[in-house]
Swiss-Prot record:
It comes from Leptospira interrogans serogroup Icterohaemorrhagiae serovar copenhageni (strain Fiocruz L1-130). It catalyses: Hydrolysis of proteins to small peptides in the presence of ATP and magnesium. alpha-casein is the usual test substrate. In the absence of ATP, only oligopeptides shorter than five residues are hydrolyzed (such as succinyl-Leu-Tyr-|-NHMec, and Leu-Tyr-Leu-|-Tyr-Trp, in which cleavage of the -Tyr-|-Leu- and -Tyr-|-Trp bonds also occurs). It is an enzyme of class 3 (hydrolase). The gene is clpP2. This is ATP-dependent Clp protease proteolytic subunit 2. It holds the Pfam family CLP_protease. Keywords: Cytoplasm, Hydrolase, Protease, Serine protease. GO terms for biological process: protein quality control for misfolded or incompletely synthesized proteins.
Amino acid sequence: MPETEKIAEVFEELTGSKISKNFLDHRKIFLWGPVTDESSKDLVGKLLYLEMKDPGKKITFYINSPGGVVTSGMTVFDTIKMISSPVHTVCMGMAASMGSVLLAAGTKGERSIWPNGKVMIHQPSIGGQIVAPATDLKIHAEEILKTKTKLNQILADACGHPISKLEEDTDRDYYMDAEEAIKYGIVDKLATKIDFN
C-alpha cells in the first residue's frame, strides 16, 4: 500500500474515532443501519457508560435504521427503560420495524423526527430457512405470535392507542411521514434544528 493511502487511512480512523468520542462526550449516540447483535452491544455499552458517568442526564439517540433482529433490539429497548437518564429519540431518515420500536422507546414528550423522516411499523417475521420437524415449527410459530403481541403492546402503550389498532396497522407494512408519525403518537414533535445541548 502506498504511503499516501496509509496516511489517509490513519487520518480517517483517527478523525472518525475523534468525532465519535466527541459525540459520546456530548451524550449523543447513533444507530445507523440494521439492529444487530453488534449494533445493540455498542448501543447498550454506550447507554450504560453514560448512565454510569452522569445518571439522570439527558441522552440523545439518533436513529436511521431499517430494523433488524428483535432480540437485539429488545436489549436496547430494555436498557433505555431501565436507566434513569431520559433518552430523547430522534428519527433521521428512517425508523422502520425494530427501529420504530426504539424510536417509540424514548422519553414521552422528547421523541422527534426530522422533516423528511419516515417511520414504518409492521409485524415481526422469521428470517432465513427453517428446517425442523412439524412440532418445532409449531413452537416457532407460537413464539413469533407472542413476540408480535408483545411488540404491538409496546407500540400501543407508547402511542396511546388500543392494542387492536396496532394489530390492524401492523398486519402489513404501515408507513408514516413526519406529520403522520406525530399524529400517530410514535413521536411527539418535529425537529426543526439540531440540538447540540
